[in-house]
């Protein structure tokens, strides 16, 4: 992978999306690309898609499989990451402790020590979905000192919250002084 760089007038950034299986990472990836709903299968390995953003930013989105047997390889995808996106299934309260533990393990990796984090609380269209304050409390996001982060509600199914998620992604990228200095 690479880092934020400027080739000509276009900045490039590597965005890695992680989260437990069935959180909706692949559906989010293709919705961000502008596709309507697509049928997805569990990701074995990863999916990679470019996303041209207004403002001369070219994003490469890496959607890394979240099945338990694939998580050991997550660290292989962290080197050169400019923004880490962690996708949560807001309706799966039973697996939230597992999701939190996996997120903390990723964030402990030295290669992403200063990398900004965007947490996407997916499946917010479901009435029983956890609220953002509930998710914030359970993740302990306030404890991420020294790291730029944001938490956004979204729905890969309806597309709700995705424009705001992209705006947050852009803001985090701009705030990343280490990224911009590369």
From Swiss-Prot:
SUPFAM superfamilies xref list: P-loop containing nucleoside triphosphate hydrolases
Pfam family, any one: Arf
GO cellular component, as recorded: cytoplasm; plasma membrane
Gene name as annotated: ARL11
Protein name, as recorded: ADP-ribosylation factor-like protein 11
Keyword Nucleotide-binding in annotation: yes
Annotated lipid attachment (N-myristoyl glycine): 2
Organism per entry: Bos taurus (Bovine)
Keyword annotations from UniProtKB, A to Z: GTP-binding, Lipoprotein, Myristate, Nucleotide-binding
TM stretches of this protein: none
Annotated binding of GTP, by residue: 19-26, 63-67, 122-125
Highest taxon, organism lineage: Eukaryota
């Amino acid at each position: 992978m690479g880092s934020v760089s400027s080739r000509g007038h276009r900045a490039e950034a590597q965005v890695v999306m992680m989260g437990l299986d069935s959180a909706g990472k692949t559906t989010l990836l293709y919705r961000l690309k502008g596709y309507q709903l697509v049928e997805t299968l569990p990701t074995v390995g990863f999916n990679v898609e470019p996303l041209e953003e207004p403002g001369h930013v070219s994003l490469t989105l890496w959607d890394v499989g979240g099945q338990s047997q694939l998580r050991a390889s997550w660290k292989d995808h962290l080197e050169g990451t400019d923004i880490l996106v962690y996708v949560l299934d807001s309706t799966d309260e039973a697996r939230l402790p597992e999701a939190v533990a996996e997120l903390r393990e990723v964030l402990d990796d030295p290669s992403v020590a200063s990398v900004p984090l965007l947490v996407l609380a997916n499946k917010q269209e479901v009435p029983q979905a956890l609220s953002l304050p509930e998710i914030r409390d359970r993740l302990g996001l306030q404890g991420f000192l020294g790291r730029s982060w944001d938490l956004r509600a979204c729905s890969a199914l309806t597309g709700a919250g995705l424009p705001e998620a992209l705006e947050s992604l852009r803001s985090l990228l701009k705030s990343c002084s280490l990224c911009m200095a590369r």
